[in-house]
Regions:
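Active-site signature of alpha/beta-hydrolase-fold catalytic machinery across serine-
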Residues: 132, 136, 197, 201-205
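Active-site-facing substrate-recognition patch
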Residues: 19-117, 131, 135, 148-183
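Short helix-loop-beta junction
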Residues: 135-144
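A structural signal for isolated positions on well-ordered beta-strands in alpha/beta enzyme cores
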Residues: 117, 187, 216-218
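DG-centered beta-turn motif at the end of beta-strands
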Residues: 189-192, 196
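Glycine-rich phosphate-binding loops at beta-strand->alpha-helix junctions
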Residues: 120-130
């Protein structure tokens, strides 16, 4: 059958478009995709129903962490593939490019007061990765290495999706560290963040141990 012109495509409209893209635009897009660093807002309110699960927490969170930072999201076009491969691979020391990206993120972070120390969260999946990242940040940033915030032996497994039950499982999960002589902001490092409750509860442990109010969560990925 004979077709009729639709008037929309370049053949019908008589307009030809080139596939060429301005090199400056390509460079700008590539730079943006490869630039690490995203803000992670802290939790501001306790979940409803905490009293029903036996924890007397309600209202506004006053002892949580400050705004955190990650290299990127696992779904990102830029860093996403690299970070997924890193977290899916067997545990290993932090690769040079990931350490460099982390340092770049921290260098661009608007701190009122420079961090004085860095600490890693205990991990059952990436203890070597987190520990080596803490060591690298301590060396590059000349920060005090506080080691690892260790889990208690009797801690509950965190399996619930419900926020109240996640907080319940994380409550009293860590051994209170010795922060004697630490005066100033602390970087708290983990591999990945999802709900934000792990850092919220871990920050409370550091605050009870005498940490400065400015605890900066530092994740590899979200």
């Amino acid at each position: 059958r004979d077709g009729a012109a639709g008037g929309r495509c370049d053949n019908c409209a008589g307009t030809r478009y080139t596939a060429a893209v301005d090199s400056a635009a390509v460079d700008a897009a590539r730079d943006r995709l490869q630039r690490p660093g995203l803000d992670i807002s802290p939790r501001l309110q306790w979940p409803t129903g905490m009293a029903k699960v036996g924890i007397e927490l309600s209202g506004r969170i006053i002892d949580g962490p400050a705004t955190g930072r990650v290299i990127g999201r696992l779904t990102d076009l830029g860093w996403g593939v690299r970070l997924r491969r890193l977290l899916e691979a067997p545990d290993e020391p932090v690769p040079a490019d990931v350490l460099a990206a982390t340092v770049a993120v921290l260098a661009a972070w608007s701190w009122e007061t420079r961090p004085v120390a860095v600490m890693g969260l205990d991990s059952s999946t990436h203890p070597v990765l987190i520990g080596s990242l803490v060591e690298g940040l301590a060396a590059v940033g000349r920060l005090r290495n506080l080691g690892t915030l260790r889990y208690r032996g009797d801690r509950r497994p965190v399996t619930a999706a419900n926020s109240a039950y996640r907080v319940l499982a994380l409550h009293a999960s860590w051994v209170e560290p010795d922060l004697d002589g630490v005066v100033g902001p602390i970087l708290l490092v983990d591999d990945e963040t999802d709900t934000g409750w792990t850092f919220t509860m871990a920050a409370r442990v550091l605050r009870r141990a005498g940490a400065d109010a400015r605890i900066g969560p530092r994740h590899i990925a979200r």
